[in-house]
Amino acid sequence: AFFNRGGGYVGICAGSYLAAANYSWSLGISNHKTFCETIDLPDIGRKSMWYRGPSATVKMELTKAGREILGDRNGVFQVRYQNGPIMSPMGVKGLGAFRTLAIFRSEVVRYGPQKGTLVNTPAIIAGEYGKGRVLSISPHPESSAQLYSLVANGIRWAGRR
C-alpha cells in the first residue's frame, strides 16, 4: 500500500540488501540481487565473499542518470565502503529493471577470489516499485560532509520532492 500511494524507499548499505530480490527475508522491491556466495578457501576455511574487512575508502563515479538525480558531480570521487552489497540484475518478471546511478571504480579485497567482483559494478541504483521509487546505495556517502547533497538529492528523488 505504501508504494502504491507513491511512497519512496532509500536503503544505504544493509538497506540495499533489504531491498534486494534474492533473499527469503528481503523486501523484493528492487530488481537486483547481491553477491553473497560462501566458498572454501585453502588453509583458511569457509568464508563469506561479501565480507571485505573493516571500513575503507573506494572510488565511485556517477553515471549520466546519476548526475541528473543525485547532483552534477563529474569524475571519480572517494566514498566510504563497509561491506555493502555488490548489486546486479535479478530478472524478476513484473519488477522493472533498475537504473545504475553510480559505479564503483575501485574495490576492497580481503580474499583472493574477491578480486574483480566489486570494481565496475553498480554502487547506487534506482528503480520503481508500484507507484513508488526505490534507491539502493551500497557504500556510505552519508558519512562524508562533501557527499551530504548527494544523499539529500536521492531522498528528494525517492520522495518525489
Question: PLM features: residue spans?
Answer:
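Glycine-centered flexibility sites
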Residues: 6-11, 15, 84, 130-132, ...
